[in-house]
Amino acid sequence: MLNPILYLAVFSLVFSVVLRNGLPHFPVYLLSGLLAWNLFSTSLAMGARSVVDNANLVTKVYFPREILPLASVGAAGVDFLTQSIVLVGFMAAFRYGVLGWNLLLIPLALVGLLLFTSAFALLVAALNVQYRDTQHLLTLALLVWFWLTPVVYPSALVWAGIHRFRFLYLANPVADVVLGFQRALYGVVSPTVVHQGGKVTTIHVLAPVSLGWLVMLLGAVAVGSAVMLGLACWRFSTKDY
């Protein structure tokens, strides 16, 4: 419960006070992206250590080893539900309600995220058994991955600057999922903000990806991740861990 609140306090101070980005309803925007990111990163961090940390159990009792990293995803899912309560609380406090068809993006994005995360958790768990530095390299990789994913900054800023390379940005499955969560929970692509003095400014926050394209992207993530998970489970079962 404290993790998303701590993130919120730090990033709100940096981006709203120090950098003065003026992003409207920043807590809602930040938490909607953190929901997806924390589920992904926490699952991988725990999944990478799952087999190694349970070495005594693995050597004494036979059971499908893939249960261990997949259980890490399940544990992170419990945290996801807790953090969802925090987000709902902030939305209620800000009287920020989002209704409409965009909410249907959440189950599609969540399914894709769980499949992708499960496949990746199996991969890093297997690698960490053979190469113990994997969990340390994973920490660095997740740090880079975090900043390649539009959690704390408006995706519209990146979208406007990369032009022909936008397809590379959307090739990041976690970015696609985060965009789905933000479109569903944060809502509008370009909110209009009225500043002091009556000046009206339109701030572009979310990348202008059409709802249809976003659905196709999330569908592709789900299908591709399902194939990855099947292959990962098969490969994991053939190894003697």
Question: What spans do the regions from the language model cover?
Answer:
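Hydrophobic transmembrane alpha-helices and immediately adjacent juxtamembrane helices
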Residues: 1-241
